[in-house]
From Swiss-Prot:
Source species of the chain: Hahella chejuensis (strain KCTC 2396)
Domain of life: Bacteria
Encoding gene per record: prfA
Name of the protein: Peptide chain release factor 1
Localization annotation: Cytoplasm
Modifications the protein undergoes after translation, according to the UniProt entry: Methylated by PrmC. Methylation increases the termination efficiency of RF1.
Major subcellular site: cytoplasm
Keyword Ligase listed: no
Length: 360
């Protein structure tokens, strides 16, 4: 291990112990905001420090085994040889784990997100597929104990959605969903197809991190046009009786957001503003990324919603992620919400790219 990395790990270990002591200080406990801030830092440091401790234990085991290689007892020497091999293998893996843990963390990884799904080519079948995708992400969210709220929806004529926007809240949401942005393609025989022909349809998915601080995005109220209208869809007696739904247009960019989920106009406006901030921030970051000269394009992809990233082939029970040439024959499990076998390889590829760029 490089001396600079070891020095950094020693500093992180010292800070971990310092924060641990502060968290038991009654003066800190009484200040809720400070206690929350330190608790978050402690939780972020813990996996790094624990891994570093295991790495140090493995190094100690290597030294002890080497000493026993010269023992007069043949059985003891053989045992030391086996233990040395195991400790060396363990230390190599732990060093790799530490390198990944020390990679710069995207500050947005812990953010909640807005999940946008829009039906593309394919008419009714595309809208039905949009509904399938929304159900897939909702079930994945359920497995992760995340909360999903629909912000706005436009139902398809024969099921599914022409468009559905939802807010997904919980731990590590953006980190796990950030590579879902792009065009998702489905190949299957529609229920309405009498000849049994396979149709191809597509939907676009966009993952927008929620903006936590108002200061992150500067919006001039004069740049906004706010319209109210009557909500449509489920809602019992209140439907079409009050203008509770909100449509906000950001005039300089032309971005339009809507929210009709809540019965309160005030709540709908707050949700719509939150979505608008996320869209404006995402737009600015996309522009910045395009302007930056990149020596190579990321295999994981740019997050451009027009980029075809994945195909769901029902006749073959196959799902293929085109960015990393990943093919799995477990389509049914994935669309039922078991997304980790797709998401984890994408994260690993991203980490490998970052490690390669750091070592270049």
């Amino acid at each position: 291990m490089k001396e600079s990395i070891k020095l950094k790990l020693d500093l992180l270990k010292d800070r971990y112990e310092e924060v641990g002591a502060l968290l038991s200080d009654p003066d800190i406990i009484s200040v809720q905001e400070k206690f929350k801030e330190l608790s978050k830092e402690y939780a972020e440091l813990e996996p790094v420090v624990q891994c570093y401790q295991e790495y140090q234990n493995a190094l100690n085991a290597i030294e002890e085994s080497k000493l026993l290689l010269n023992d007069s007892d043949a059985d003891m020497r053989e045992m030391a040889k086996e233990e040395l091999a195991a400790a060396e293998e363990s230390s190599e893996q732990l060093e790799k784990d530490l390198q990944i843990l020390l990679l710069p963390r995207d500050p947005r990884d812990g953010s909640n997100v807005f999940l946008e799904i829009r039906a593309g080519t394919g008419g009714d079948e595309a809208a039905i597929f949009a509904g399938d995708l929304f159900r897939m992400y909702s079930r994945y969210a359920e497995l992760k104990k995340w909360k999903v709220e629909i912000v706005s929806e436009s139902p398809g004529e024969h099921g599914g959605y022409k468009e559905v926007i939802s807010r997904v809240a919980g731990d590590n949401v953006f980190n796990l969903l950030k590579f879902e942005s792009g065009a998702h393609r489905v190949q299957r025989v529609p229920e309405t197809e009498s000849q049994g022909r396979i149709h191809t349809s597509a939907c676009t998915v966009a993952i927008l991190p929620e903006v936590e601080e108002v200061g992150d995005v500067d919006i001039n109220p004069a740049d906004l046009r706010v319209d109210t209208y009557r909500a449509s869809g489920a809602g019992g007696q209140h439907v079409n009786k009050t203008d509770s739904a909100i449509r906000i247009t950001h005039l300089p960019s032309g971005i339009v957001v809507e929210c009709q989920d809540e019965r309160s106009q005030h709540k709908n406006r707050a949700k719509a503003m939150s979505l608008l901030k996320a869209k404006l921030l995402s737009s600015a970051q996309e522009k910045q990324a395009k302007e930056q000269a990149q020596t190579r394009k990321s295999l994981v992809g740019s997050g451009d919603r027009s980029e075809r990233i994945r195909t769901y082939n029902y006749p073959q029970g196959r799902i293929t992620d085109h960015r990393i040439n990943l093919t799995l024959y477990k389509l049914e499990e994935v669309v039922q919400g078991d997304l980790d076998p797709v998401i984890q390889p994408l994260l690993q590829e991203y980490q490998a790219e970052m490690l390669a760029s750091i070592s270049e």
